[in-house]
Amino acid sequence: MREDRSMKKYIFPIIAIVLGCSSCDSFLEKTPKDRLVPETYFKTENDLKMFSNSFYDNLLDKTPYDEQSDVMFEKGTISDELLGGTAREVPQAAASGGWSWGQLRKINTMLGHMDQCTDAEVAKQYTGLAKFFRTQFYFQKVMRFGDVPWYDKELGSRDSSLYKARDSRELVMSNMLNDIDDAIESLPSGKSVYRVNKWAALMLKAQFCLYEGTFRKYHNVTLPGHSAEDYLKLAYQAAEQVMNSGVYSLASDYHELFREPDADQNEYILAIRMEQSIGCTHSATSYVAMNTGGNPGFSKKFIDSFLMKDGTRYTDKPDWETKLFVEEVADRDPRLGMIIRLPQSIRVNSKKTIYGPELTMTSTGFQLEKFVMDPQYETAERANMSFNDIPVYRLGEAYLMFAEAKAELNILTQEDVDNSINKLRDRVGMPHLVLAGLTVDPFLTSETYGYQNLAKLNPSNLAQILEVRRERTIEMALEGRRWNDIVRWKEGATWTEPLYGMYFPGPGAYDLTGDGNADVYLYATAKVDNAVKKQYGDNFTYLQIQEIEIDGKYVPYSDGIILSEGTKGFVAMHYKKARAFDESRDYLYPIPSGDRQLNPNLAQNNGWADGLDF
């Protein structure tokens, strides 16, 4: 399951790190809760700060990778969510699979004792902080499970409310709106990249309102209270406040923004701080640069969505699907070369100089570059040793949420685009998005690669919505948004689209660096021909094109490569893995059967069979 895999695998060993790494020595570790007497605590700012440090732990699911999505996946395995069907099961253990509530109990405990604080202004600020985290906690729960029980006070072990049914989605969302508005009013407005402030609260509001507005729109959900349009309006208004605050500005270099050790305090609104000296690290670089790191790669679909640097569509070119790598990535949106390794990419460390992508280190040939630290920080290439800060919210996302909410309401103007998306394009030297004369991109609506649900709905401003989605997918790549974007847009069919990579027309030598010399040789025989080895030498990359099936049995790769059409086609390491998506079931996760046994009033989400008949 996504929540269980994410930070354990990609961020750092299981230590209690929070923003600023403060929980490494937090009060909650020094003083276990069974020795904390609430009635005599929560009196000073230091009490509140130390207790609330652990709230930041909940931000740690903000991974630097979309490790299960249609745009990026690993070489050896793909997630249960991408496999779908019987690969997805109802968890049995109580409090597993994301159905855990300990963090909420801590938040409600502090709120319940806030009147003990002797400083009214401090109490107001920390009330706002707690309500921010309660909103964030419930946002994660609603995205994962839909209806959930709402609790706004600490409950005793015998309280009957522990066994109540799930509350309606609208009740929970309305309470979240009340909480986040209190947080916006109460939190400080100064920059504090490692601590929650007013602007982080506005980003959270924009984020969950955009999610809810689009979820209700595309899933056709109508509930008493707020409408989809209400949430979309709240989303763009919150994002606009951040945009117009004058507090933040875009960093000048998109590439460096994600690989510098310290968070850019102009663009980053809230970040997870990493500190190598005390072991607060993650594995973004080693995940890409080591054989044991997962060997992730971007899908061809993602690469093909990038425009040419002159603003025209790559997929309008003749034979676009079967162009070789060097030609395929030439003259594209400059962000492509900041997100993947291009032919001219050079990486130097103490062991070797690496040119272009390393085909053996990626599932598709399209090797990740974003979040990979500069080679000068060589220790980052060791397992779990990257120390560049991870963004939670940044100004670039505010621009995208603003534009998307307005597009979904069909009120997006050229002025809106110039104040949002075109600022992101200006940063990398891309031509502006111009709404006048905009036409639908067939690639983005195709059955093979496109948004099929949106294409069927065919709204009057289809072209606008598609271009906003293109921009979001590119700009926010690897920032942990893609899965939930697909859910809220009701585009689950994209998870069954082909997981393809680079195209190779057959065995032979291929240039991946654009210098006219071969870098890799693909062969479809039992071993490399001696004449070929003599020509290219031993210090060269040879990859066997492996048979997908032999005598009716699927043969997995070892050090070879699988192509979609046998000895030619797209890199397709997961070609024979059956994948499915159940539109009636898979947009929500199941509640663990153990929790339903403890509380029979909890109804199971539709389509999830757990063997419990009540």
PLM region spans:
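C-terminal substrate/ligand-recognition segments
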Residues: V329, D333-R427, A578, E583-F614
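Short coil/turn linking the two alpha-helices of tandem helical-hairpin repeats
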Residues: V142-R144, P149, K191, Y211-N220, ...
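Long, intrinsically disordered, low-complexity segments
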Residues: S100-W101, N175, R259-L307, R425, ...
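Conserved, well-structured interaction surfaces
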Residues: E45-N53, D57-D61, S79-F145, S160-R195, ...
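C-terminal motif of bacterial Sec signal peptides marking the signal peptidase cleavage site
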Residues: C21-S23
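An aromatic- and glycine-enriched ligand-binding surface/loop that stacks and positions planar moieties
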Residues: D25-L82, M173, D181-D182, R195-L202, ...
